[in-house]
């Protein structure tokens, strides 16, 4: 602590950018910051079960080294001394990597995910691995290895998934930011439910390397590379200003994820926004109707832009109701994915046996991922002809949206039909992921942001979408709307 000035502030409420600046200026100690984050996580964990694995001792060692680097005037990375968490299934060499599966209960990561390696090189310190849905196959965080993660605003409600544990740690002030992954809303859905910012970057920007299907065993398989093209790793943050900094650090080709072809640099000045398209689609087929709170949030977002002189237009397409099935069709027809291969961790999956074991109280798999795998097998039975019309709808939407996204336009629409529902609700409403999942197969960047208000005690959110490679436009919009609506609100823990 010698040489470090002390400031009287709640460090846990600050952004990663602010914390890095204070550490660099010797205003706060990385050691003190890590201890405060650990203390907060020890408060939150018994209430929400957000953490899968604690990395406390390694983090303390890293913080001591980070403090020494500051005091001795050594070169510092952009996020030097700033703690973060990451999804358990991403992979941190030597740490557990069960992905929430009993079949992998003794598995440890043999390598560190590219995005985590880049954050470490920037000086950030991993504090914990976040709980997740089993094999990242469900929009709720509940598994047979680590248990269920609870929402910090109302513990009777879901934290979302699959990156639910990290979203809760960010929302409750345990870490300033986290790394998640998104193949069908797995960053954006928990971000929405926990009142934080979550970005699924443009296709081709951030490598998935380390996470299924680009893990140590599968990364070279053609099907793995094809599936990864519809996934992305990305940041979860309390403040919009952190999104771009983290994105700059983690973006760019690594030679493993063959879908990646570019990096990201924040532009020196914001591109003026000229048009905002407001979309309030009919409910996704077999999904939940939009709540009044979410509908009002989308409309009010448009109104705030109109007040700034931005042109605001309504936009929709009838095929948006098929969003879930478009997502499923693309994955089935263009990647040949079989979720049973992942749920069974490469071993054949016997559905009758798995269902019998679940009914007998001896489950092998979490209910949600097992249902997802069954639904996926139904898609196999439909075959390509049965799914072909959804591929045509994908092509139509891609063309229509590409015509809207001219580099100065964004789309505003729901991320979820309402606020976080009760635990287990996704079993009755799995199709609700369509609002987010659609943009995985379209490839456009999509960002979920909190509206600074609550409904039924839980955060309300909207989703922003821009053209391919126009991530900076989304980040600027997030900063504007954060100022307009207030952004993150501290949960009552």
Predicted regions and their residues:
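Glycine-rich, small-residue loops and helix-cap segments
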Residues: 26, 81, 121, 125, ...
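Glycine/threonine-rich flexible loop motifs
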Residues: 97-106, 291, 421-429
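Acyltransferase
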Residues: 30-35, 64, 290-316, 339-351, ...
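Short glycine/serine-rich loop segments
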Residues: 112-247, 440, 445-452, 458-461
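A short helix-breaking turn/cap at a secondary-structure junction
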Residues: 200-302, 485-493
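Acidic/His- and Gly-rich active-site-bordering loop/insert found
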Residues: 69-144
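Short helix-loop capping/hinge segments that flank enzyme active sites or metal/cofactor-binding pockets
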Residues: 79-99, 272-281, 333-398, 402, ...
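An N-terminal boundary/leader segment
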Residues: 1-61, 307-309, 380, 490-493
């Amino acid at each position: 602590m010698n040489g470090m000035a002390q400031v009287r502030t709640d460090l846990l409420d600050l952004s990663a950018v602010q914390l890095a600046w204070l550490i660099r200026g010797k205003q706060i100690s990385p050691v003190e910051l890590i201890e405060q984050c650990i203390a907060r996580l020890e408060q939150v964990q018994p209430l929400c079960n957000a953490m899968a694995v604690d990395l406390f001792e390694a983090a303390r060692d890293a913080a001591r080294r980070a403090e020494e680097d500051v005091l001795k005037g050594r070169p510092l990375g952009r996020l030097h001394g700033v703690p973060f968490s990451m999804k358990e299934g991403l992979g941190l060499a030597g740490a557990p990597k069960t992905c929430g599966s009993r079949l992998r209960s003794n598995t440890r990561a043999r390598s560190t995910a590219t995005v985590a390696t880049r954050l470490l090189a920037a000086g950030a310190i991993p504090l914990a691995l976040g709980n997740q849905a089993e094999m990242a196959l469900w929009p709720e965080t509940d598994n047979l290895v680590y248990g269920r993660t609870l929402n910090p605003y109302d513990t009777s409600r879901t934290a979302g998934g699959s990156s639910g544990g990290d979203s809760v740690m960010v929302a409750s002030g345990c870490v300033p930011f986290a790394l998640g992954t998104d193949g069908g809303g797995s960053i954006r859905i928990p971000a929405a439910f926990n009142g934080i910012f979550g970005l699924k970057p443009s296709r081709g920007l951030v490598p998935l390397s380390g996470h299924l299907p680009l893990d140590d065993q599968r990364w070279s398989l053609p099907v793995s590379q094809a599936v990864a093209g519809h996934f992305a790793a990305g940041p979860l943050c309390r403040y919009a200003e952190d999104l771009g900094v983290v994105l700059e650090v983690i973006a760019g080709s690594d030679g493993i994820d063959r879908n990646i072809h570019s990096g990201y640099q924040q532009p020196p000045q914001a591109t003026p926004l000229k048009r905002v398209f407001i979309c309030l689609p009919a409910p996704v087929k077999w999904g939940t109707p939009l709540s009044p709170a979410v509908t009002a949030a989308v409309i009010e977002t448009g109104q705030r832009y109109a007040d700034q002189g931005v042109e605001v237009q309504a936009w929709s397409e009838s095929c948006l109701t098929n969003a879930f099935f478009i997502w499923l069709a693309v994955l089935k027809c263009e990647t040949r994915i079989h979720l049973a291969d992942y749920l069974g961790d490469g071993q054949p999956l016997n559905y009758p046996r798995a269902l019998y074991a679940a009914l007998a109280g001896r489950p092998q798999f979490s209910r949600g991922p097992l249902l997802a795998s069954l639904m996926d097998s139904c898609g196999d039975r439909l075959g390509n002809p049965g799914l072909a019309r959804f591929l045509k709808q994908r092509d139509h939407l891609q063309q229509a949206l590409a015509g809207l996204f001219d580099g100065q336009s964004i789309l505003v629409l729901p991320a979820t039909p309402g606020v976080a529902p009760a635990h287990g609700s996704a079993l009755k409403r799995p199709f609700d992921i369509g609002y987010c999942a659609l943009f995985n197969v379209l490839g456009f960047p999509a960002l979920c942001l909190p509206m600074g208000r609550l409904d039924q005690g839980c955060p309300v959110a909207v989703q922003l979408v821009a053209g391919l490679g126009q991530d900076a436009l989304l980040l600027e919009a997030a900063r504007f709307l954060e100022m307009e609506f207030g952004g993150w609100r501290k949960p009552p823990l």
